[in-house]
């Protein structure tokens, strides 16, 4: 029997939610009731699969903590009042911390003036953010398209490359094995994981995947395309594969890919949605090799963990294909004043506090500690790797990785696996994480591994 719409039920539910939003604290009974509600609503109205995932990485087989508020720049508090050190960082959105006061203030000030743009008049913050990114990004990157997420940023990059290269008879893209570029149809065509791709086949034609970090395979793909008349329009790469398991290519790989693109007249698209905004110890990971892309994709941390925003930045030569008709690719909420205010404040904080350099220093401290633990527990840990504050601990199998995440949850540290590689646990904290908290994270990791070792020995 079909359920009839109920305005009264919707009104009551929305009023209840607004009441919760207004509250700063909850008593014990309110906390218990909220937990039950959230679990029930996820099961009945969001997706029950999320509950099973949360259950697999939390302590005691619970469905996990119900998030309530930020505790500090570097911590989260659940409805039970438990404070967790955030080493997941919302998959890389909290580079400047949770509720950074500079970012929050900028958004609040803009909210008091004009939350969204008229679509017809020129909006100043979009112009100022585009100018700021032109100054901040490497090489000849100059023009920006703004959107709301990483996958939208990649979609824009692919369409821009198509519009530029189609008149030149070039239609094929090279992506890499293990890549993750998003889950909308175009971005998914560049993404490599079969689990995400197979249900939506056939995807967009014209995408080849070659092994990541293998410059010979990349060179062969270019040469074969030239021989067969199926010439390469663009290469799309992550400088470090995030969801693939924090996979670093050999030093010089990006430089060699840039040379191939120049030799064969292809565009280089760098997806820095996860590696950008100071995460790896430079503002952009491509700066470790002084590589200058033709198109750069940003999102996640660009909004300071306060507003969603993505950006696709391109050279004037490439972006000029949109000059005659700027409506060829647009989005209603892209570049809205609130999101641009957040992005401008985020860039200001990153530069004023020199957070990329801090990421390099504190990342070295954490990575050294994780590598020491890998040496101490070789039967559990295969490898620790990373750059800056983008790190991963790879375990011997998926089950061991899940167990580590659960044990860290007991230690009040949030971590999780990567989307393409379940046995790899990412460590991606805010760049504002203090040295004291870095030491606490390492202590918690040691305690977690020790508990896991005891369980192994008891079997």
From Swiss-Prot:
Gene Ontology biological process terms in this record: L-lysine catabolic process; putrescine catabolic process
EC identifiers of the protein: 2.6.1.82, 2.6.1.29
CDD domains for this protein: OAT_like
Modified residues (N6-(pyridoxal phosphate)lysine): 300
Kinase in keyword set: no
Entries under InterPro entries matching the protein: Aminotrans_3 (IPR005814), Aminotrans_3_PPA_site (IPR049704), Class-III_PLP-dep_AT (IPR050103), Putrescine_aminotransferase (IPR017747), PyrdxlP-dep_Trfase (IPR015424), PyrdxlP-dep_Trfase_major (IPR015421), PyrdxlP-dep_Trfase_small (IPR015422)
Cofactor(s) named in the record: pyridoxal 5'-phosphate
Catalysed transformations (reactions): an alkane-alpha,omega-diamine + 2-oxoglutarate = an omega-aminoaldehyde + L-glutamate; putrescine + 2-oxoglutarate = 1-pyrroline + L-glutamate + H2O; cadaverine + 2-oxoglutarate = 5-aminopentanal + L-glutamate
Class of the enzyme per the UniProt entry, highest EC level: transferase
Positions annotated to bind pyridoxal 5'-phosphate: 150-151, 274, 332
Purpose: Catalyzes the aminotransferase reaction from putrescine to 2-oxoglutarate, leading to glutamate and 4-aminobutanal, which spontaneously cyclizes to form 1-pyrroline. This is the first step in one of two pathways for putrescine degradation, where putrescine is converted into 4-aminobutanoate (gamma-aminobutyrate or GABA) via 4-aminobutanal. Also functions as a cadaverine transaminase in a a L-lysine degradation pathway to succinate that proceeds via cadaverine, glutarate and L-2-hydroxyglutarate.
UniProt name for this protein: Putrescine aminotransferase
Primary gene name: patA
């Amino acid at each position: 029997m079909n359920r009839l719409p109920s305005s009264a039920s919707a009104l009551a539910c929305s009023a209840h939610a607004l009441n919760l939003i207004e509250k700063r604290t909850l008593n014990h009974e309110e906390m218990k009731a909220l937990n039950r509600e959230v679990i029930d609503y996820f099961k009945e109205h969001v997706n029950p699969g999320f509950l099973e995932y949360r259950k697999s990485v939390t302590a005691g087989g619970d469905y996990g903590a119900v998030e309530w508020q930020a505790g500090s720049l570097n911590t989260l508090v659940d409805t039970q009042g438990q404070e967790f050190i955030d080493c997941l960082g919302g998959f890389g959105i909290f580079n400047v911390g949770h509720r950074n006061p500079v970012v929050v203030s900028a958004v609040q000030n803009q909210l008091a003036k004009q939350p969204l743009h008229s679509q017809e008049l020129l909006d100043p913050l979009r112009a100022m953010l585009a100018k700021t990114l032109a100054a901040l990004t490497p090489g000849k990157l100059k023009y920006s398209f703004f959107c709301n997420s990483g996958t939208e940023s990649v979609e824009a990059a692919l369409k821009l490359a198509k519009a530029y290269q189609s008149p030149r008879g070039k239609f094929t893209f090279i992506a890499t094995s293990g890549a993750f570029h998003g889950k909308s149809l175009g971005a998914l065509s560049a993404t490599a994981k079969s689990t995400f791709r197979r249900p939506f086949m056939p995807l967009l034609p014209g995408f080849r995947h070659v092994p990541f970090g293998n410059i010979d395979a990349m060179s062969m793909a270019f040469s074969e395309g030239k021989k067969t008349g199926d010439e390469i329009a663009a290469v799309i790469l992550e400088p470090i594969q995030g969801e693939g398991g924090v996979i670093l290519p050999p030093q010089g790989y990006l430089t060699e890919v840039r040379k191939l693109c120049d030799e064969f007249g292809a565009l280089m698209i760098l997806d820095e949605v996860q590696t950008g905004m100071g995460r790896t110890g430079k503002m952009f990971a491509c700066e470790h090799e002084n590589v200058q892309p033709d198109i750069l994709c940003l999102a996640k941390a660009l909004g300071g963990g306060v507003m969603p925003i993505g950006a696709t930045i391109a050279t004037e030569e490439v972006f000029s294909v949109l000059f005659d008709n700027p409506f060829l690719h647009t989005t209603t909420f892209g570049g809205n004043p609130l999101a641009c205010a957040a992005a401008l404040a985020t860039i200001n904080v990153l530069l004023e506090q020199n957070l990329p350099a801090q990421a390099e220093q504190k990342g070295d401290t954490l990575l050294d500690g994780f590598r020491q633990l890998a040496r101490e527990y070789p039967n559990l840990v295969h490898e620790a790797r990373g750059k800056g504050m983008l790190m991963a601990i790879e375990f011997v199998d998926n089950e061991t990785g899940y167990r580590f995440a659960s044990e860290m949850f007991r230690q009040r540290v949030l971590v999780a696996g990567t989307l393409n590689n379940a046995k790899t646990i990412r460590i991606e904290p805010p760049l504002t994480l203090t040295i004291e908290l870095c030491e606490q994270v390492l202590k918690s990791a040691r305690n977690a591994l020790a508990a896991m070792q005891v369980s192994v020995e008891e079997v």
